[in-house]
Each structure stands twice: as C-alpha cells, then as structure tokens.
Regions:
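N-terminal binding-site loop/beta-alpha segment at the start of enzyme catalytic domains
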Residues: 1-96
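Beta/alpha (TIM)-barrel catalytic core signal, keyed to glycine-rich beta->alpha loops juxtaposed to Asp/Glu
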Residues: 2-16, 144-331, 345
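Active-site groove signature of glycoside hydrolases
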Residues: 128-148
Length: 345
C-alpha cells in the first residue's frame, strides 16, 4: 500500500509553460513534455522517478509519454507512473495528458509485437492495468508494420477510442505517405489522427523532407522525440564518455557515433549557444520548436537538475535568421535515426 498523499502541486505551475495547439484539434500540449523511456524503469530508484515527475508537473509539464515496453524491464515505466497516478498525482488526473504506445516487442510469440489488431488492443489493456487507469489520453501505433494491412492497425486505434480506452489516436515514426494513408483511414472511421511522434534533432532532420508538410496540410500535431540526439547535443561527452552515460551503458547510442566530425559539430553548436546565452542542450531543444508545426518536444531526465536544465530552453525560443544560418552549418544529418526501419516502410 502507498502512503498518504503528501504532494502539493505548485499553484503557479501554469504561469511558466507555453502550451501549443496539437494540429487543428482542441488539445493543447506543453512545449516541453516528459518522456519516460529509459529513466523510469524498475532498475531505477522509485523516489528519484517520483521527484522528477513531481518537479515536472510543478514546472507546467502536463504531458507524460510512455510505451508498453518502456523500462527496463518491459512494462515497469508504466508501473512506476501508475504508482504516482495512484498517490501524488491522484487529484490531478484531469490536468494530465498520459500517452502510451504499442508496436515493439512486448511478450513472446507471434502476437507480442507489430500492428495486428490482436496485439495492439491486448497491449492497451495491459498498459491500462499497469497504469491503473480506465483510459489514456493518446494511444499510438509505435511503428509502421510492413506486413499488417494499415487498415487493421488504424482500425485497432479507432476501436480503442470508441471503447473509451483512449481519447485520441497517434502514430510514431511513420513515413510521410504512410502518414497520409493512416490519416485518411482514420478519418474514414471517424477518429481523426491527432498527432505524429517522430525522432527529431539537429543531427536527425528527416521530418523536414516531407513529413512536416504532410502534417501541416492535414492539421495533425507533431511531438519530436530524442531532441538531444541521445545526449550528443549536450555537454555530457565533451570530455569523453562518462560512466553511466547512454554510450557507456550501451543504451541506444553506439560508441561509434561519437566521431571526431560529430565532436567538431557539437563544438560549433556550443559556440553559437554560448553567444545566445544558453546551454547547448537548451538551444537544441528550442531549435526543435522553432517551426510552428511542432507541438512539443519530448525530453528525458535522470535527475531533477537535468529536467530543470532542459526546461531552460523556454527562456529563449526565438532565433534570428543569422543564428539559424549558422546552426545549419553544423546541424546536418549524422546517421543517428535509429528508428529509420519504421520510417522507411
């Protein structure tokens, strides 16, 4: 049993965070949202996760992004957040946007991944049990399935909404034309596509080649993940590979990505950030929000201090033309789209 609720949310939490419309929908999301991918699993101290989430809400972050297999181990991030929803956040459910996803491997056998109706809807039921919720706000197809008809996967999202288990439907890492097709199918079913969640950073700009145009045309929101290129766009690797970092732990960022060319680009970007009076990470996050078609950017955090540093991006969101031109000299594709298998479908 959890102890009594002792958390008192900051009464000024909505005064510091800008909220942006999700496409043409009625839903507003904070400019910065919190992703619970690698830092909220069962391998992390619960009190650390608790402190980060509480501080996020105090800073005006109302959107918390999950997936069925976030951890490690799989499912444990949803369980951690479910504990918080049952205690500290219990009075605030209607002030929160909780999202989860299904698409990657979750359990053994042929029904434990991809985009079949059987897997997608079973996964959502499991997620709701772990979260202790009757519904999530946004339910995503986590990746494109090359072998399952798109009509089946989108039909499962529509069913989730019609059953009241999700309020909105989303997709993640879908190519531009497949996004257009998915939106058309959902429109035909009467459940509009709310949002797309692609990877997007200064070193991973694939969405600028057609996807943002499609989303703008369709009135679909966009929330970018991995905006700091798995930590490359921070000061973390300026002096080598620190213990406990993603590279050191072999988590999603291969050591061969930290090339001399990448280090030189990071150094150039850091100089521009210094000229703006911002840390590199803050500038990199602000840069992902420079396009009005971007609804929000997803940050991760392993500590309260790291979260607070990321939110400093809001101190200066504007860029001059000269700054953007200077950034473009260094912000070039760096072959770090680890999710291209889906976006190439």
């Amino acid at each position: 049993m959890e102890g009594p609720v002792t958390y008192l949310a900051d009464p000024d939490r909505y005064s510091r965070m800008p909220y942006r419309r999700t496409g043409r929908s009625g839903l507003l999301l904070p400019a910065i949202s919190l992703g619970l991918w690698n830092n909220f699993g069962g391998d992390r101290p619960y009190e650390t996760s608790r402190a980060i989430v509480r501080r996020a809400f105090d800073l005006g972050i109302t959107h918390f992004d999950l997936a069925n297999n976030y951890g490690p181990p799989y499912g444990s991030a949803e369980e951690t957040f479910g504990r918080l929803l049952a205690t500290d956040l219990a009075p605030f459910r209607d002030e929160l946007v909780v999202s989860t996803k299904a698409g990657y491997d979750m359990w053994p056998g042929p029904y434990g991944e991809w985009g079949s109706r059987k897997y997608v809807l079973a996964s959502l039921d499991q997620s709701l049990r772990r979260l202790g919720l009757d519904y999530v706000d946004i339910f995503y197809s986590h990746r494109a399935d090359p072998d399952t008809p798109l009509e089946e996967t989108m039909g499962a999202l529509d069913t989730a909404v019609r059953q009241g288990k999700a309020l909105y439907a989303g997709i993640s890492s879908y190519a531009p034309e497949r996004t257009r097709e998915a939106a058309a199918i959902l429109d035909g079913l009467g459940t509009p596509l709310l949002i797309h969640q692609p990877s997007y950073s200064m070193f991973n700009r694939w969405i600028e080649d057609g996807l943002l145009d499609v989303l703008g045309e369709l009135g679909v929101g966009c929330i970018g993940f991995s905006p700091l290129a798995q930590g490359l766009l921070t000061d973390r690797y300026s002096e080598g590979i620190p213990e406990g970092s993603r590279i050191a732990r072999d988590l999603s960022l291969p050591a061969d990505q930290l090339t001399e060319q990448t280090k030189a680009k990071v150094a150039g970007l850091r100089e521009i950030a210094n000229g703006r009076g911002q840390p590199l990470a803050a500038m990199a996050l602000a840069w992902t929000l420079r396009d009005p078609r971007m609804t929000s950017t997803l940050v991760g955090a392993s500590s309260v201090g790291q979260l607070e540093q990321n939110v400093r991006a809001l101190d200066r969101l504007d860029f001059t033309v000269d700054e953007l031109d200077a950034i473009d000299r260094y912000a070039t594709e760096s072959d770090i789209n680890l999710w291209s298998e889906s976006s190439d479908v």
